[in-house]
């Protein structure tokens, strides 16, 4: 109940915290890439783009004072979180099967440069042999598993924020004549 009251009173702060969480997750990914030496697969890169989109949308929503704007941007952010969770779930699914059952795909940048977007996106989501590899884990969960958990939690928080915002807007709206 206390969480709901906090969300009701400070929706812009919640959006700013979600944006900061996305930036922190991106920083973790860059640390794993540049310091630890892990090379991101195509699906990891798509998840990074989803995090960037989520950070931008929630950052903009926290900066806008008009309720209609933050509700619209929050709804787009919730859809972006759902997309990121879907890609992370797909990658987790690929990891749960033996590597020999996953066919190797093309390089991410090669797909983008060689194919139109309508053909590149299905190829990226299909994954590659690299997407099935588990090179690092924390508490038994792969990066894809943790990514799914983060996207799902951020998406649920955004949905709760939207539900409270829409409910509050309905209560304050004048009654129809």
UniProtKB/Swiss-Prot annotation:
Cytoplasmic face of the membrane: 1-14, 65-70, 165-177
Entry membrane topology: Multi-pass membrane protein
Any one of the GO CC terms: plasma membrane
Compartment(s): Cell inner membrane
Coiled-coil annotated residue ranges, if any: none
GO MF term list: electron transfer activity; protein-disulfide reductase activity
Protein name: Disulfide bond formation protein B
Species, as recorded: Verminephrobacter eiseniae (strain EF01-2)
């Amino acid at each position: 109940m206390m969480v709901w009251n906090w969300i009701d009173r400070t929706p812009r702060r919640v959006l700013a915290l979600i944006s900061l969480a996305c930036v922190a997750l991106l920083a973790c990914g860059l640390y794993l890439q540049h310091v630890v030496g892990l090379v991101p697969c195509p699906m990891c890169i798509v998840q990074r783009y989803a995090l960037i989109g989520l950070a931008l949308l929630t950052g903009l929503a926290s900066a806008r004072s008009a309720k209609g704007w933050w509700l619209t941007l929050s709804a787009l952010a919730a859809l972006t979180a759902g997309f990121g969770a879907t890609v992370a779930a797909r990658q987790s699914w690929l990891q749960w099967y033996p590597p020999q059952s996953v066919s190797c795909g093309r390089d991410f940048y090669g797909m983008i440069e060689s194919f139109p977007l309508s053909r590149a996106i299905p190829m990226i989501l299909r994954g590659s042999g690299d997407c099935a590899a588990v090179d690092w884990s924390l508490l038994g969960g792969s990066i894809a598993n943790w990514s799914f958990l983060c996207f799902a939690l951020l998406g649920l928080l955004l949905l709760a924020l939207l539900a409270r915002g829409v409910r509050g807007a309905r209560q304050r709206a004048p009654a129809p004549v």
